[in-house]
């Protein structure tokens, strides 16, 4: 069976209604994307914590519907637009979707990733390229963090250079658990991973078991009291600013912290918030993203 993708762009306030109508009228699947992705106008979907969502949600959406090649896309879209209450049918383009071995195609897109000196992030269907590598076996899944994003890479490089045997580590916003697992493989003692998403917590636990890494995971309310030798948080700039006092309090005096999920243009603003507690600066930049790192002062 052959398929086509129907692609339409429209204001965000109409995207959800149109996507629902397309599904009701026979589309096989529908996704909504930020039409401004990878441009200066790109925005978080629901807005970062601390900002007004109405001002930061996607302003321009792209609706992509997978349809059977026998369906008339113009008729389908017109009916969906009418069902959604749109004043007119959006303009659209069609993309042919070739038959594929989707499992093989997906696997081909995820090759082993070399990070730092000895780190390799390796999907389960590959072998580590180096016999002496520090290997993290990780498949793409529900939670953020496979090593491909610049912020994850930066944090991993920092951890490889920073973690000392037996140190305690907190990974706040752990996603897939990749940073927590790496910390453990670098010789850390007690390692804790925290995330607001229960699915991420479950994914991280699964990944830790696969990598034989003894890491404790939980939601924010499960975060243990006390301080850590190392804290790493790869989130976004606004949550990092909102949580500055809390995250800084989790670092032992003299301990180290690394922050990422921060664009280079946001670095000074984030650093200024943490400067009250931490001697902090840009540690490294990669593809427009930075990792801020510093040491908690003995008293503040």
UniProtKB/Swiss-Prot annotation:
Q: Per the UniProt entry, what are the Gene Ontology biological process annotations, in alphabetical order? A: methylation
The reaction(s) catalysed by this protein are: L-lysyl-[protein] + 3 S-adenosyl-L-methionine = N(6),N(6),N(6)-trimethyl-L-lysyl-[protein] + 3 S-adenosyl-L-homocysteine + 3 H(+)
**Subcellular localization:** Cytoplasm
Please give the Gene Ontology molecular function terms for this protein.
Answer: protein-lysine N-methyltransferase activity
| Residues annotated to bind S-adenosyl-L-methionine | 152, 173, 195, 234
Keywords of the record: Cytoplasm, Methyltransferase, S-adenosyl-L-methionine, Transferase
Gene Ontology CC: cytosol
Q: SUPFAM superfamilies recorded for this chain?
A: S-adenosyl-L-methionine-dependent methyltransferases
Q: Which domain of life is it from?
A: Bacteria
Give the Enzyme Commission number.
2.1.1.-
Provide the primary localization: cytoplasm
What is known about what this protein does? Answer: Methylates ribosomal protein L11.
User: What family does the Swiss-Prot or TrEMBL record give for this protein?
Assistant: Belongs to the methyltransferase superfamily. PrmA family.
PANTHER family in the cross-refs: ELECTRON TRANSFER FLAVOPROTEIN BETA SUBUNIT LYSINE METHYLTRANSFERASE
- What name does the UniProt record give this protein? Ribosomal protein L11 methyltransferase
Protein's organism: Burkholderia mallei (strain ATCC 23344)
